[in-house]
Amino acid sequence: MRHCDSFCELIPMKGCEAILEWMIDQGAGREPADIVLKGGRFLDLITGELVESDIAICEDRIVGTFGTYRGKHEIDVSGRIVVPGFIDTHLHIASSQVTPHEFDRCVLPQGVTTAICDPHEIANVLGAEGIRFFLDSALETVMDIRVQLSSCVPATHMETSGAELLIDDLLPFADHPKVIGLAEFMNFPGVLAKDPECMAKLRAFQGRHIDGHAPLLRGLDLNGYIAAGIRTEHEATNAEEALEKLRKGMYVLVREGSVSKDLKALMPIITERHAQFLALCTDDRNPLDIADQGHLDYLIRTAIAGGVEPLAIYRAASVSAARVFGLFDRGLVAPGQRADLVVVDSLEGCHAEIVLSAGRVVSEALFAARKPVAEVGRNSVKAPRVTASNFRSQSNSGKTRAIGIVPGKIITQNLEFDLKVGPNGVEPDLERDVVKVAVIERHGKNGNIATGFVHGFGLKAGAIASTVSHDSHNICVVGASDEDIATAANRLGEIEGGFVVVRDGKVLAEIPLPIAGLMSTEPYETVREALRKLRHAAEDLGSVLEEPFLQLAFIALPVIPHLKITDRGLVDVDKFEFVGN
């Protein structure tokens, strides 16, 4: 069977006509189907019924349901339920710390047959080259990876990124077959202020899909933002906010990632009435959580266990998601639909036993047949070497702002502490869980270093550091001592980026991420186990966070309220301005 996004896309017209004839004959039962799933039931997302029926597949399409079929290859699914493949509607594959090829291996066997990604992590480091890497990868993966073009690179001009993408940089990719539209428009102040570059991007993509990103934006300002042609929102963190955005015509993407965990708060809106306006997304989810909990299958299980009707959550996971993004060829178990199917043990359990992607049974052999894509972004960490003296506060006042971590959220608090002033300036207060945070520019542009304080990590010693630091991906370090902060930052330069845990000048655990300082060259299984060691090492330092490295990754994102830090200093996100310590 030929793999393509449409059965006619890569086939000459004569071949296309033949395939159409095969589909008609196999659907009508005149010829054996290529594949038949026999003996099970499927979930009809239109009526909500569980239907006992064979499912016939020709090439990459479902051609028959509500009947009995013969197949060239028959698969017994007795006692199981067949559901449409799951669609992750907003994610950053780089946050899994693996390449798109390894992400494919990691999540497709769990039922995610379509992923709509924003490559802005690698775009912030490499620019157009990073987007091209993702598009080239998307042409080779078994799952269908679709790409939203990164709209805000950098997210703001309050940080130093490795690249800047203007409208003229994006337009050459606009007609690529894997591109849907424009990715999350994070700079909502720029939209409301009618910033010229924001307006140029919005005008160019009018009539196409434009993703939103507007945490806590409400009232008339929200109306203005939506009026710009922005259709979706994944930043709603409570039911009241989500309902306002639904009432104003936005589609809400219910998010549950490794850090941003909004599913429980949004369960009240996941109903059969609202489901057609909802979809699911993970945003940022690492391979350790995927292995231990699952991906969208985990969201489905969790929602049903929390009282959500199965029909509502399965609609949000597939057909509603497909409709939101204009992918009308998938999302149902019905003739003519793309044969993206998941055979699960039960609706409540949602454990994938067999997965089909475009009519192909997912297996390691299928992954092994993919063409590789050349690596990009090596040696991208160009930060200056630092010493402890680079992180000493020069302030004479102990009254100090601190970023307050909110576990399970990327929103932070704007706190203030009265800290002791010593010979090296303002000192951390480990008893009150206040330690230092630093951001170091790593793209070789200016060598900026900014320092501040953070509350909520629980560190009693050492430091943890990362080059995964949204969105410009500079080095971000949190530590209890200046010496360990310096050691951790310098080690990241030596390993081409990644994650590091340090105590008393020694590296306790690390993961090199040499592809743009964001992704590993190793299989996801290797990354998963390295992440496990990193978590344990961070816990040994006193970390109380479930996901300390992804929590660290959002400290430098100045488009998420309330207090953040970039390489240029502390940012009051509510006022959208720099503030002093």
Curated annotation (Swiss-Prot):
Top class in the EC scheme: hydrolase
Matches recorded under SUPFAM superfamilies: Composite domain of metallo-dependent hydrolases (SSF51338), Metallo-dependent hydrolases (SSF51556)
A Pfam family: Adenine_deam_C
EC numbers, comma separated: 3.5.4.2
UniProtKB keywords: Hydrolase, Manganese
Record field: catalytic activity: adenine + H2O + H(+) = hypoxanthine + NH4(+)
Cofactor: Mn(2+)
GO biological process: adenine catabolic process
Alphabetized GO MF terms: adenine deaminase activity
Family recorded in the similarity comment: Belongs to the metallo-dependent hydrolases superfamily. Adenine deaminase family.
Protein's UniProt name: Adenine deaminase
Organism: Brucella melitensis biotype 1 (strain ATCC 23456 / CCUG 17765 / NCTC 10094 / 16M)
Source species taxonomy: Bacteria, Pseudomonadati, Pseudomonadota, Alphaproteobacteria, Hyphomicrobiales
Gene: ade
